């Protein structure tokens, strides 16, 4: 109750009629200052360890609650495939693992700028239906709110260019390997050079964004899309990988009292590659804690 009152007070001080995400971020930054008296430095090992321990304690507390959230993601994915297999034309999703992997791949670029439910789910499903109908992966993202393959509001988010790039890579892989070969490749390790070469063959330039390591470093195939959307696809396939979306970035920075960028905007993504790598270490340390 005290937290809600403070968030409401922060919102009112800015002239907001109801609290916004920015107001909650300010509350957490204020709370952090009250506890520690300063920001914690993620590059300082002692501060980093303190944030890891605090995070692990929060998770243990939450797991002891009646509604812990444990397993919700896996259950949602399982239920999604069960529901999709009831759609005419998608019956194979009930037991066709390769087709399921293809859907999880299509769900990655179509997630950009969208909520998982219903926008992302509808867009990925429409793309799969389009492929099964024509034999070609669609690469021209429909506008937000469009009716696609008979599905209402199955368009993509505002960043059409980013969606288009990911779909081109998937299209190239399916055309050159077939669906079964694609599924094997998507969940198998490849060098960063191979991922980059695939992107170039699909008409793109440069290595996948956010994927660190030298040209001989190994990464699962889905990372050809880049760190964020590639790991999102891995999550849908049951792999433990941290998607560094706005929610994760906010949670990570909350533990250091650093939820805002120098310009005052909310930190909604890793600020640079070193921070991205530190986030990976953070997750590993919390799991070990």
What are these model-derived regions, one by one?
Residues 2-289:
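HhH-family (HhH-GPD) DNA N-glycosylase catalytic core used in base-excision repair
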């Amino acid at each position: 109750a005290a937290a809600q009152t403070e968030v409401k007070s922060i919102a009112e001080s800015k002239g907001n009629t109801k609290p916004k995400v920015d107001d909650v971020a300010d509350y957490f930054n204020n709370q952090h200052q009250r506890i520690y008296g300063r920001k914690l430095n993620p590059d300082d090992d002692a501060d980093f360890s303190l944030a890891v321990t605090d995070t692990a304690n929060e998770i243990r507390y939450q797991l002891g609650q009646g509604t812990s959230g444990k397993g919700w993601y896996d259950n949602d994915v399982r239920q999604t495939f069960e529901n999709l297999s009831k759609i005419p034309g998608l019956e194979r999703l009930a037991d066709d693992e390769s087709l399921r992997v293809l859907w999880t791949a299509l769900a990655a670029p179509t997630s950009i700028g969208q909520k998982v439910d219903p926008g992302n789910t509808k867009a990925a499903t429409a793309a799969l239906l389009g492929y099964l109908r024509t034999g070609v992966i669609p690469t021209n993202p429909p506008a937000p709110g469009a009716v696609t393959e008979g599905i209402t509001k199955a368009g993509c988010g505002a960043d059409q260019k980013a969606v288009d790039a990911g779909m081109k890579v998937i299209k190239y892989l399916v055309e050159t390997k077939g669906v079964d070969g694609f599924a094997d490749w998507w969940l198998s390790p490849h060098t960063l050079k191979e991922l980059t070469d695939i992107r170039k063959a699909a008409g793109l330039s440069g290595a996948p964004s956010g994927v660190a390591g030298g040209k001989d470093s190994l990464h699962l195939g889905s990372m050809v899309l880049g760190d964020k959307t590639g790991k999102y696809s891995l999550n849908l396939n049951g792999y433990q990988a941290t998607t560094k979306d706005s929610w994760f970035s906010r949670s990570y920075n909350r533990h250091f009292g650093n939820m805002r960028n120098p310009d005052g905007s909310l930190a909604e993504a890793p600020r640079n590659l070193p921070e991205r790598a530190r986030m990976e270490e953070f997750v590993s340390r919390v799991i070990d804690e």
